Amino acid sequence: MSMTDNVADMLTRIRNAYKSKLINVSFPSSKIKTSILDVLQKEGYIKDYITTQKNNISYTEVALKYSVNGDASICEIHRVSKPGKRVYSAIKDLKGYYNNMGIYILSTPYGVMSDREAHIKNVGGEVICKVF
């Protein structure tokens, strides 16, 4: 059985790993997933990630980030735009997620970026997911 939404699979694996208090999580790699992980790392939601090759298949391993008292850095991570229903937004329509404590991750003509960076560049796009 083939997977229809690879990004949703990645987000679910990260969410489940945080709920299980795992240190690392791995999944098959792709360019869009790497771009999303770049944004998560830049915004401070994950420690780091590496891409490795096993049997001609690329895998990404993500080092999850926890606070000193063991709380997860990501409370919620949800897919917004799905293959069956794409969600696009102009930058003026994107209000701060959780009173600017969370972020939206957007796919724009200038690449994948957070809503904060999109506000600076004044560009909208497809809303991939929301993170808090």
Curated annotation (Swiss-Prot):
PROSITE patterns the record matches: RIBOSOMAL_S8
Keywords: Ribonucleoprotein, Ribosomal protein, RNA-binding, rRNA-binding
Keyword hit for Nucleotide-binding: no
Annotated Gene Ontology cellular component terms: ribonucleoprotein complex; ribosome
GO BP term, example: translation
InterPro entries: Ribosomal_uS8, Ribosomal_uS8_CS, Ribosomal_uS8_sf
Domain of life, source organism: Bacteria
A molecular-function term among this protein's GO annotations: structural constituent of ribosome
Binding partners and assembly: Part of the 30S ribosomal subunit. Contacts proteins S5 and S12.
Family, as annotated: Belongs to the universal ribosomal protein uS8 family.
PANTHER family the record matches: 40S RIBOSOMAL PROTEIN S15A
NCBIfam families per UniProt: PRK00136.1 (NF001109)
Function of the protein: One of the primary rRNA binding proteins, it binds directly to 16S rRNA central domain where it helps coordinate assembly of the platform of the 30S subunit.
Protein's UniProt name: Small ribosomal subunit protein uS8
Organism this protein belongs to: Rickettsia rickettsii (strain Iowa)
